[in-house]
Swiss-Prot record:
This is Small ribosomal subunit protein uS8c. One of the primary rRNA binding proteins, it binds directly to 16S rRNA central domain where it helps coordinate assembly of the platform of the 30S subunit. It comes from Rhodomonas salina (Cryptomonas salina). It holds the Pfam family Ribosomal_S8. Part of the 30S ribosomal subunit. One of its GO terms (biological process) is translation. Belongs to the universal ribosomal protein uS8 family. It is found in: Plastid, Chloroplast.
């Protein structure tokens, strides 16, 4: 049983990237599915699908690589807000990751958004992770 499903997801993606795996399997929750949606919209993964039923639902994420060297599109992932120390930011304090080259994933009242979309909509929320 994993307490922090977001950290588990980020770790699985990081390890699969380092091993140059094409597909990574993560447990499916509402939050991991929303984060996968953001990764897909921002072009960090090719696609994802939900398989299984009931308590055994899994997300299959197709990772994206570039060039003949198969360099990962995702350079790094960093968990920010965690169960032991929640991190919140209002719309004025939303972080910029690497000066705009990366994204911050924010959980807002209107769902999980990137920092740019949250800033555009004037929303703050919990800063889940950074991806670049």
């Amino acid at each position: 049983m994993v307490n922090d499903t977001i950290a588990d997801m980020l770790t699985r993606v990081r390890n699969a990237n380092l091993a140059r795996h094409q597909i990574v399997q993560v447990p499916s929750t509402k939050m991991t599915k929303n984060i996968a949606d953001v990764l897909l919209e921002e072009g960090f993964i090719q696609n994802f699908e939900e398989v299984g039923d009931g308590i055994n639902k899994q997300l299959l994420l197709s990772l994206k690589y570039k060039g003949k060297e198969r360099e990962p599109v995702i350079t790094a992932l960093k968990r920010i807000s965690r169960p032991g120390l929640r991190v919140y930011a209002n719309r004025k304090e939303l972080p910029r990751v690497l000066g705009g080259l990366g994204i911050a994933v924010i959980s807002t009242s209107r769902g999980v958004l990137t920092d740019n979309k949250a800033r555009h909509q004037g929303l703050g929320g919990e800063v889940l992770c950074y991806i670049w």
